[in-house]
Amino acid sequence: YGELARSTRDGYTFAGWWTGENGTGTEITEATVFTGASDRSLYAKWIFDVYTGPAGGLVFYENPNWKVDGWKYLEAAPDGWYDGDADSDGVYSSEDGDPFFQWGASGYVLNPSTTGTGIGTGSSNTANIVNFHDTLWAQYPEKGDYYTNPTEYNNKNDGTVAATVCADYRGGGYSDWFLPSKDELNLMFQILHLNNFSTFESFYWSSSEDDADDAWMQNFYGEGSQRVFWRDFTFAIRPIRAF
């Protein structure tokens, strides 16, 4: 293909030329052979330069629509963010410091729903999850408070709610932390985990509900697969914030 120009962009690392936008399609190098004389469009691939954010975590995403959405960056809590106590079996903390909790009450459809999966939906998902569990007793007064009487709602629930733990986090003095949505969690896998910016060696909950019994989670052990799983199962969590 011959000599290719290099490009620069503030806050990003240039990662080559590709046949599709945003680093999709096929990478084109100086050794690539094309046949034919027609012009071809090439697209630069950019990798966001992760840096330490105002809350002491890792900023891993820049929102291209920040003027409309009202937030520009996503910041993940740092390793060791959780300072709570593990129970006698240690189920609330993993070897890297990320705690394990249930997603929430199993068998109940949240209203408003928390089915948002896209980038930018984690905050509203989290607020809806917290409000639902905080007020569940009002819908079922005979069962009482969910956090103290979880088995009244489902005999497999233990009263922990992943989104509530994230919302209660006050890292860096900020109170706007939330449980990431399905797509926000995948960004953390692609940008932070695969590039060794932080320690993620577990299965992680997202804030994206699937149905009354299941929510989306992601495997950070290797391939990064996402799937729905029972909400009464315990998985690791890592809060993020938008600013």
Where are these regions (language model features)?
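Secondary-structure capping and domain/repeat boundary segments
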Residues: 1-48
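Short, charged low-complexity linear motifs
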Residues: 1-7, 84-85, 187-193
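Intrinsically disordered, low-complexity segments enriched in Ser/Pro/Gly/Ala and basic residues
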Residues: 6, 37-40, 92-93, 105, ...
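Predominantly extracellular/luminal cell-surface or secreted proteins
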Residues: 17-20, 61, 77-79, 188-191
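Short hydrophobic beta-strand that contains or immediately precedes a catalytic carboxylate
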Residues: 76, 179-180
